[in-house]
Amino acid sequence: MAKKNSQLPSTSEQILERSTTGATFLMMGQLFTKLVTFILNNLLIRFLSPRIFGITAFLEFIQGTVLFFSRDAIRLSTLRISDSGNGIIDDDDEEEYQETHYKSKVLQTAVNFAYIPFWIGFPLSIGLIAWQYRNINAYFITLPFFRWSIFLIWLSIIVELLSEPFFIVNQFMLNYAARSRFESIAVTTGCIVNFIVVYAVQQSRYPMGVVTSDIDKEGIAILAFALGKLAHSITLLACYYWDYLKNFKPKKLFSTRLTKIKTRENNELKKGYPKSTSYFFQNDILQHFKKVYFQLCFKHLLTEGDKLIINSLCTVEEQGIYALLSNYGSLLTRLLFAPIEESLRLFLARLLSSHNPKNLKLSIEVLVNLTRFYIYLSLMIIVFGPANSSFLLQFLIGSKWSTTSVLDTIRVYCFYIPFLSLNGIFEAFFQSVATGDQILKHSYFMMAFSGIFLLNSWLLIEKLKLSIEGLILSNIINMVLRILYCGVFLNKFHRELFTDSSFFFNFKDFKTVIIAGSTICLLDWWFIGYVKNLQQFVVNVLFAMGLLALILVKERQTIQSFINKRAVSNSKDV
């Protein structure tokens, strides 16, 4: 296993195999971590009020914002580092250079770029936290330990950024198993720390001073959240560093320090006295990073803009309700869609570092199959989600939430999930194949979409008083615009590969399934409506199984082809 992890995947078959296997690892990791956080939230939700969930969601938003702006552009850009040559040299013979030293220089290039997130994140975290601290509700500032909680959140950001060089290397080598394992351990540790502190205070067994009032308990609940985040970051760094000491340092594959890289021009490669230069950052990757960073700024404003809006236009209680919706409503998105989206992005970025026709056509084939899967699953969500979601959610939340509108709002949120998911894979494809100029053009459109999103949110929340439902509708409009933009790009890209053939032509055979889904939906609403008891829920499960059976029969050839390919791949491994 260690040997496999130390090899850079080079052929399209190797990259596809690691990516499909990696998607499974990420899904299992997501399933485990979300199961742990799911259990924790269900335990904590009976101790904590919506107000506390609102402020912890706000603190998590600050942490997520700093980490996103610090590292995501680098994570995307380093995937485009070519592993097919590029004139990186050493003084050893050519064979040894190709096998060992070249790989070392490629990984060192990635490590050098991994320093940039820390340089961005350190000042950004201080500035953003200082700015947001002045805007926090005065009630929370007066809570015990609140300033300590803010400091611990900042410290967790810094510690997590220190693990970035190790993450970048494992990402570039498509070592999904290590990453999934380390993140699972870190999340579990953070959740355990969080729960132990809250539970101990509630039981008053290990009080910090004299904990008698609700204010004291709320202050410690926020402190527990911050301690959990810090424990998560420290554990993640420790796991990655242990992996480095075990698998990388003995082989001297790269240095954790910023290191100059020697290169020579390709046209000088065959001469006896090659002209060599040195650099810290590969120029084409650095230029791509700048353009991607600009684009991601607007993408994050749109992706996380709902939190900005809800912090400005909604009460703390409504913020807590929306945080609960995000946790439960998007559970499927984070467990299934997010790992697939990330695996697709990594797969495409590595595959298309060499733009040959075979790789380009393979990328389209993978995207078409994923899109078909997403459309089927989205149909299931739209047909059965609104009717069943509130029935399932009421068993997971405590009495403190029974007087809120969360059971009604979750039904609206179900319509948002398909748009969120489809946009994820479309933008993953766009970011992987687009040139720097195309990404820059996309950034300008994202700027316009940001303005439309803010305007829609203001109209629907502030003027029409739709509260959280208005925010969800604004998000749906936002996703539709982004899907349309990437859809036009995909269609043009498809026509260049397959002359006079539309990308959307691959989805013309959905008529039967859509009619069946619509019929089931109408019957379900006519005879049952919103599910209120177990008997009605069982009927919906039977309806869902019938629709799923129809989908499986319709796609039986594709499924059989995939199984055959996996069997051939496994036989080669043996």
Curated annotation (Swiss-Prot):
InterPro entries: RFT1 (IPR007594). It holds the Pfam family Rft-1. It is a multi-pass membrane protein. It is found in: Endoplasmic reticulum membrane. This is Man(5)GlcNAc(2)-PP-dolichol translocation protein RFT1. It comes from Saccharomyces cerevisiae (strain ATCC 204508 / S288c) (Baker's yeast). Intramembrane glycolipid transporter that operates in the biosynthetic pathway of dolichol-linked oligosaccharides, the glycan precursors employed in protein asparagine (N)-glycosylation. The sequential addition of sugars to dolichol pyrophosphate produces dolichol-linked oligosaccharides containing fourteen sugars, including two GlcNAcs, nine mannoses and three glucoses. Once assembled, the oligosaccharide is transferred from the lipid to nascent proteins by oligosaccharyltransferases. The lineage of its organism: Eukaryota, Fungi, Dikarya, Ascomycota, Saccharomycotina. Keywords: Endoplasmic reticulum, Membrane, Sugar transport, Transmembrane, Transmembrane helix, Transport. One of its GO terms (cellular component) is endoplasmic reticulum.
